[in-house]
UniProtKB/Swiss-Prot annotation:
It is found in: Secreted. It comes from Lithobates pipiens (Northern leopard frog). Glycans are attached at N27, N67, N91. This is Amphinase-1. Belongs to the pancreatic ribonuclease family.
Length: 114
């Protein structure tokens, strides 16, 4: 697989969820081995409640590696500040800033415009 495809697959796993805000649980999700590759709790992670299409759309016509802002707002859940891997969870609706590489989202930069 090309590098962008692998990075996009990783981005989807780490940042896009089909679960509703009501069903989403930071502790259950963040303690999954996918988010603790080195056995450490990740300090913060933001999840986008969306299908993949609208997120990938942000990177349409993005050549090379560039940060882009979404034109629409997304429902987001941020899991952060784990104490012994127990996370605080906050929900918001906002724009997102992501890094695109050749039309694929590869990195979540921040909540809000770039």
């Amino acid at each position: 697989k090309p590098k962008e495809d692998r990075e996009w697959e990783k981005f989807k796993t780490k940042h896009i969820t089909s679960q509703s805000v009501a069903d989403f649980n930071c502790n259950r999700t963040m303690n999954d081995p996918a988010y603790t590759p080195d056995g450490q709790c990740k300090p913060v992670n933001t999840f986008i409640h969306s299908t993949t299409g609208p997120v990938k759309e942000i990177c349409r016509r993005a050549t090379g590696r560039v940060n882009k802002s979404s034109t629409q707002q997304f429902t987001l859940t941020t899991c952060k500040n784990p104490i012994r891997c127990k996370y605080s969870q906050s929900n918001t609706t906002n724009f997102i800033c992501i890094t695109c590489r050749d039309n694929y989202p590869v990195h979540f930069v921040k909540t809000g415009k770039c």
